[in-house]
Amino acid sequence: LGYYMDDWAYVFYANLKGINSLQEMLTYDSRPYAAWLYMLGFNILGFKPIAWHIMSLLMHWGIVLLLWLLIRAVWPNRKIEAIQISLLFAVYPFFMIQPFPIAYTHIWFGFLAFNLSLLLMVWAIKVNTIKAITFTVLAMILEAAHLFTGEYFSGLEFIRVLFLWILISREEPIFSQKVKKVFLNWLPYLLVMGAFAYWRIIVFENPPEITRNSPVILQQLFT
């Protein structure tokens, strides 16, 4: 086990230019708020490939566990299906280049934060008001964490509406009230997503000499 392909860019910056230089590197990569994750990783794990591989594997299995808990929370009677889906995700988590121990840390973190955020949202629907507020706030923090660390899961955020609809439909038979409750429960997460979209499209600017991956079409819609 070692480092592969994109891993070496992180190793180069952290080793030759200092761990704090990862902030510069990821700003050029259009993900300035992902730097904290890699800086923390190098400060804790150092430059030993085996340490990064173990951390990657632990995050992977943490995601699988959270996915299983999420499915069981939404569909308590679907025990077999929950295991099957979780095991399928363990083998194929929607991308093929899993052996990279460093370069895709923000992907694993995104999955981890996203799944935990969804689970907390589901719990918030099922408990009393005080606990619901606590779970909702924690879910919003995790939503912001995964969005600002990497934008990959921004589209998946719309899955929240589906989960909310399923859960609220079980308790509310009237369609108009169902729509209202789903929207009100989704609104806090929609505000977080809106704040991220505003920052990413309007506020954030790449360094002057860097133009790749710029959301030109989206920016033109707002200018």
Language model segments and positions:
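Polytopic membrane enzymes that build or remodel cell-surface glycoconjugates and lipids
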Residues: L1-T223
